[in-house]
């Protein structure tokens, strides 16, 4: 019944019974778990997974290989929330109840957990966040130095390097054109 609901599914995409998939969603070969909510106009690209009870907003792009965590295994207190218009780059991982606010862009390979430092480096002083990415932020993988008993080592983090601009929108606009003109990909 996907076609009647205006949902485009490319086999072997799977959405478990109990997941909500809205009109206009495109599921490339991907997996959407029980209790997940995927809102209209969203693209779940090849080999992306949407975990149990995750909340994905309108017009989101989950690129190839993205992993959006669920709440069932391991048990989590809060779902991952990806707000409207966000772009999640290839092979990103977003788990443990992290919230990505409206129109944020995560570059390829960003890994966000509840304890990952998300450091805004755009100003004269860094600003640290944990558990959420501010709206329209552009985020890339990074690292910071941490002292351990055995010495100083690099620990992964995420760096906010700017805000979404028209040039960013242009890079992500192909997705919108494909949806608007109902082009099968």
Segments the model singles out, each with a brief description of its role:
Residues 7-147:
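Structural signal for interior beta-strand "rungs" in well-ordered beta-sheet cores
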């Amino acid at each position: 019944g996907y076609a009647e609901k205006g949902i485009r599914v490319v086999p072997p995409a799977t959405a478990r019974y109990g997941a909500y998939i809205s009109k206009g969603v495109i599921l490339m070969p991907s997996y959407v778990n029980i209790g997940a909510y995927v809102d209209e106009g969203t693209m779940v690209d090849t080999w992306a997974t949407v975990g149990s009870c995750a909340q994905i907003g309108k017009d989101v792009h989950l690129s190839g290989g993205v992993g959006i965590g669920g709440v069932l295994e391991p048990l989590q207190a809060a779902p991952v929330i990806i707000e409207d218009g966000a772009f999640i780059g290839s092979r990103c991982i977003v788990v443990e109840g992290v919230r990505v606010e409206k129109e944020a862009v995560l570059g390829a390979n960003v890994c966000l957990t509840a304890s990952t430092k998300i450091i805004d480096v755009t100003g004269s002083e860094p600003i640290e966040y944990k558990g959420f990415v501010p709206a329209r932020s552009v985020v890339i993988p990074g690292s910071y130095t941490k002292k351990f008993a055995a010495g100083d080592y690099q620990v992964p983090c995420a760096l906010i390097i700017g805000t979404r601009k028209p040039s960013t929108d242009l890079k992500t606009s192909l997705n919108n054109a494909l949806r608007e003109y109902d082009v099968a990909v």
